[in-house]
Amino acid sequence: MKANIACVQMAPKVCDVKHNLQKMSSYVHEVMESNPSTNLILFPELITSGYECGNTFTQIAEIAGEGPSFKTMSNLAAKYHVNIIYGFPEKEEKQSNIIYNSCIYITENGNLGGVYRKVHLFDTERKHFKKGSDFPIFETSFGKLGVMICWDTAFPEVARIHALNGADLLVVATNWENPYSDDWDLVTKARAFENCIPLVAANRVGTDEKLSFFGHSKIIGPTGKVIKALDEEKEGVISYTVDLDDAKPLRKNYYTFFEDRMPDLYKRLLSP
């Protein structure tokens, strides 16, 4: 199965949801008007809010499937018949004081397809967000998606769990900051290679209060080779048609990671 993927590299305005949604909408229009056959549009982590919102996160967080960002993006998804994934601060439905750093998946029909809550929180995120507790697979018309958010990508266990659960594509939404671009380039290629699964990653650009972000959004093949990337620290979009079936013969010839695994010897990995 082939999937035409668009990866948006954008600079959000910190704590300004209305502005960011207008900008996101413009990118959706741009992508779909230039390539109506696009299957998936991916935005970065916390793209509706920006990264350094501090206590304001509690004011602008949304319940998944409700709120301004979902209404705006679901209408666009249905209009263009395209799947959309983006990062946002999520408010737990019954506990308004509990906030997650989440990615929402909206189906090509404009429905809520699922939510992933970031498990590996980084640095100051722990002051504002509660960590997630599972790694769901999102079912689409073109294949299964395993989503990671930023620091999750530094942990090989996450991508491996997605692979074992049948993911056809690894999807990463991030706010990876300067000066750690080399680390970002390394871990994204490694996660694709060690699981022999293509990976698409959207990082933001611009500056919030203190941090600046370098972009380097990319699409990586199942052997870890970068197929297409935005290397400059500026806004833009990359699009590419990924053949999700390419990995299958590779896993039988040389990239035999799953055939050669020895889970019985890995019990130490489950210990603290």
Swiss-Prot record:
Active site, UniProt feature: E45 (proton acceptor), K118 (proton donor), C150 (nucleophile)
InterPro entries: Aliph_Amidase/BUP (IPR050345), C-N_Hydrolase (IPR003010), C-N_Hydrolase_sf (IPR036526)
Main location: cytoplasm
GO cellular component: cytosol; nucleus
Domain CN hydrolase, chain residue ranges per copy: 3-244
Xref: PROSITE patterns: CN_HYDROLASE
Localization: Cytoplasm; Nucleus
One Pfam match: CN_hydrolase
GO terms classed as biological process: cellular detoxification; oxaloacetate metabolic process
Listed GO MF terms: hydrolase activity, acting on carbon-nitrogen (but not peptide) bonds, in linear amides; omega-amidase activity
Gene3D superfamilies (alphabetical): Carbon-nitrogen hydrolase
EC number(s) recorded for this UniProt protein: 3.5.-.-
Top enzyme class: hydrolase
Keyword field: Cytoplasm, Hydrolase, Nucleus
Family to which the UniProt record says this protein belongs: Belongs to the carbon-nitrogen hydrolase superfamily.
Protein name per Swiss-Prot or TrEMBL: Probable nitrilase C965.09
Organism: Schizosaccharomyces pombe (strain 972 / ATCC 24843)
